[in-house]
Amino acid sequence: MLEIKSIPAFNDNYIWLIQNSDQRCAVVDPGDAKPVLHYIEQHQLTLEAILITHHHNDHIGGVADLVRAFPNVNVVGPKAEPIPTLTHPVEDGDRLELFDETFLVLGLGGHTLGHIGYVGDGKLFCGDVLFSAGCGRIFEGTAQQMFDSLNKLLALPEETEVFCAHEYTASNVAFALAVEPDNELLHQYRDTVNRLRAQNLPTIPTTLRQEKWINPFLRYLQPSVIHSVSSRTKNSDPLSVFTALREWKNEF
């Protein structure tokens, strides 16, 4: 079983550190090297791998400095994106071994065209595709691509832990409550999120099981969600509902 630690960066990023039992580690989406190097030094770890989900600078900005500090580190990331530091370009369906665990690479286009995720050991590192109670903005891809990516994640086991890259949960819950004001589980989750954030504690990881109950972008089949977007789209098919939700969230 791998141990996961969150390293906060910038205003709301999480860099995830994956550690095994013999002081070796990997990090996911290190937008800033400084807090990573501080943590590694403090805990006397050796950095063996960097996993990248997509090319945005708040996810890769620290990679070059980490490579300078650990010249033999493996840098894994999306083959389809312009990331010059990669040593191991990967794509959908590839597998990688990390500390005796096998991780599957998932193609998750939408936020960016080449965005990928990594799932293994019951853990999903999904970058900016799925957030707790939300999903990523569609910068390069299409609504269809993001919709397909989220459905790919929905097919994973419900107990899968979700490690996304940002602490957006409180604002996402506010939007989710605008969509489903009568969702009692959402009200309970809002209270939990508020308690955690008041103590400066992360709301992540979440689980796919929880997200199925509280995330409007995964609940496009629910009558309450369809009703909420009925003034924004003439159609009630899943993709139209999802697209209307994403456009609503953009302006929320």
From Swiss-Prot:
It catalyses: an S-(2-hydroxyacyl)glutathione + H2O = a 2-hydroxy carboxylate + glutathione + H(+). Keywords: Hydrolase, Metal-binding, Zinc. Its EC number is 3.1.2.6. Pathway: Secondary metabolite metabolism; methylglyoxal degradation; (R)-lactate from methylglyoxal: step 2/2. It comes from the Bacteria. Binds 2 Zn(2+) ions per subunit. Zn(2+) 2 binds at D58, H59, D128, H166. It holds the Pfam family Lactamase_B. Gene3D superfamilies: Ribonuclease Z/Hydroxyacylglutathione hydrolase-like. One of its GO terms (biological process) is methylglyoxal catabolic process to D-lactate via S-lactoyl-glutathione. The keyword Metal-binding applies. GO terms for molecular function: hydroxyacylglutathione hydrolase activity; metal ion binding. Zn(2+) 1 binds at H54, H56, H111, D128. InterPro entries: Clx_II_MBL (IPR035680), Glyoxalase_II_hydrolase (IPR050110), HAGH_C (IPR032282), Hydroxyacylglutathione_Hdrlase (IPR017782), Metallo-B-lactamas (IPR001279), RibonucZ/Hydroxyglut_hydro (IPR036866). Its cofactor is Zn(2+). Monomer. PANTHER family: HYDROXYACYLGLUTATHIONE HYDROLASE, HYDROXYACYLGLUTATHIONE HYDROLASE GLOB. Thiolesterase that catalyzes the hydrolysis of S-D-lactoyl-glutathione to form glutathione and D-lactic acid. This is Hydroxyacylglutathione hydrolase 2. It comes from Vibrio vulnificus (strain YJ016). The gene is gloB2.
